[in-house]
């Protein structure tokens, strides 16, 4: 896929990236990191535009293979391979090794996952870090509260906070998982609430310690407490404005050019207030937008114009639709397995809700599909392998 993508772009001199805006920003920030320059792009400087997780990964790849696009794509392809392995680990931890292998195989043959893995976009990197954080949380949930497990509980609590923070550094929308994890951890620990609260504190401590460098750096450049980025406001307005359709269209940002008279922090506040004001005054349009965004999020094939070729639509749909059917069946046969359902369905529902407000597309669903494929693997296993085992047992008898 990396070879195909690079050859297609090489034949179109006017194009540098498959998806221009975000990819160009990530690439330029990575170059700034590699050269030891200020973490900012554009004029006037945008110092808190993106979380540094993915640019750091790109910069690391550049330091090994150089700044050529094809070499970096090959490194990102290896990250896609790593995603298969982490899905295997999570599936094995949640159910068994067979489920892990089936889920990893589904990920390996997914055209969308393979295709996005070689683009200069953060989806695959976030998927890997998100899956690792989910794996650590599952490991933590299985640690007993006895005295002999105190060290193990402490270790996995801190690791859970650290892994959540690493995923957050790639995609800031993962931030809300921390309070959700704390609530679930405490309320699921019947008879051990105090110990669970201690673990929750350690998780928050691990997360906070990881966040300190970014928050401190942002305070230095903005004189404000900024735990995420200063792009949330324009992103929110992109999804809630008079011309909004559910698709991203940031043309208003260039047309209005508010950075000419505002700081980056003031600009973020300005668009946040405008988006909230518009939502309050136009609930009907907001409700219709939610429907459009929900449709874009769950659409089996990509929404973007450049991906509307028949073979692309077919390649993505022929995998996604059956996988979703197996996931529904897997959810039914696992309806009493609350941890499994939480880890596999939780992320895809979580991002679906977030993108009822922000703009929506397959891109934002894709990272959550990785854990969902574990539920699909459960459905496949119960539909085929379980029945095969039962038939062999009957024949044996």
Describe every region a protein language model picked out.
Residues 11-24, 28, 35-56, 63-64, ...:
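Membrane-proximal lumenal/periplasmic loop motifs of glycosylation machinery
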Residues 45-60, 64-85, 104, 116, ...:
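Loop-to-helix entry region of an early transmembrane alpha helix in multi-pass inner-membrane enzymes
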Residues 70, 87-109, 127-128, 148-149, ...:
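Transmembrane-helix signature of polytopic, membrane-embedded enzymes
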Residues 71, 271, 278-344:
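Membrane-interface anchor segments at the N-terminal boundary of transmembrane helices
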Residues 74-95, 128, 132-136, 325-329:
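Transmembrane-helix motifs of polytopic, lipid-linked glycan transferases
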Residues 98, 133-159, 167, 186-187, ...:
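Membrane-interface transmembrane helices that cradle and orient dolichyl/undecaprenyl
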Residues 103-111, 115, 135, 164-168:
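Short helix- or helix-capping micro-motifs
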Residues 112, 118-125:
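Short acidic/glycine- and proline-prone juxtamembrane loop motifs at membrane-interface regions
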């Amino acid at each position: 896929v990396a070879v195909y993508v690079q050859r297609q772009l090489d034949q179109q001199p006017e194009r540098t990236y498959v998806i221009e805006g975000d990819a160009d920003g990530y690439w330029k920030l990575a170059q700034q990191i590699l050269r030891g320059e200020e973490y900012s792009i554009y004029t006037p400087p945008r110092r808190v535009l993106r979380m540094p997780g993915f640019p750091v990964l790109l910069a690391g790849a550049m330091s090994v293979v150089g700044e050529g696009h094809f070499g970096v794509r090959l490194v990102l392809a290896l990250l896609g391979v790593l995603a298969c392995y982490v899905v295997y680990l999570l599936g094995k931890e949640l159910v068994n090794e067979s489920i892990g292998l089936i889920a990893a195989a589904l990920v390996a043959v997914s055209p969308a996952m393979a295709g996005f893995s070689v683009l200069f976009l953060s989806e695959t990197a976030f998927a890997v870090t998100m899956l690792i954080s989910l794996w650590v949380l599952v490991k933590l949930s299985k640690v007993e509260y006895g005295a002999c497990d105190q060290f193990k509980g402490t270790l996995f609590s801190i690791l859970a906070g650290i892994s959540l923070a690493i995923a957050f550094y790639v995609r800031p929308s993962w931030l809300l998982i921390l309070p959700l994890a704390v609530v679930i951890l405490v309320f699921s620990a019947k008879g051990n609430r105090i110990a669970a609260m201690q673990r929750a504190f350690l998780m928050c401590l691990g997360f906070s310690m990881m966040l300190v460098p970014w928050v401190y750096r942002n305070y230095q450049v903005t004189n404000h407490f900024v735990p995420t980025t200063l792009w949330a406001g324009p992103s929110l307005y992109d999804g809630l404005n008079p011309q909004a359709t559910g698709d991203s269209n940031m043309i208003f940002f260039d047309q209005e050019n508010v950075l000419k008279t505002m700081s980056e922090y003031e600009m973020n506040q300005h668009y946040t207030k405008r988006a909230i004001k518009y939502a309050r005054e136009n609930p009907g349009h907001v409700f219709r937008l939610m429907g459009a965004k929900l449709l874009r999020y769950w659409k089996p094939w990509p929404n973007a114009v450049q991906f509307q070729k028949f073979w692309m639509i077919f390649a993505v749909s022929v995998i996604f639709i059956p996988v979703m059917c197996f996931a529904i069946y897997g959810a039914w046969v696992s309806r009493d397995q609350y941890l499994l359902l939480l880890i596999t369905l939780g992320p895809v529902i979580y991002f679906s809700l977030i993108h009822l407000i922000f703009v929506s597309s397959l891109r934002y669903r894709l990272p959550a599909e990785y854990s969902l494929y574990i539920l699909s693997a459960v459905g496949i296993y119960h539909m085929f392998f379980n029945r095969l085992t039962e038939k062999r047992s009957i024949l044996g008898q």
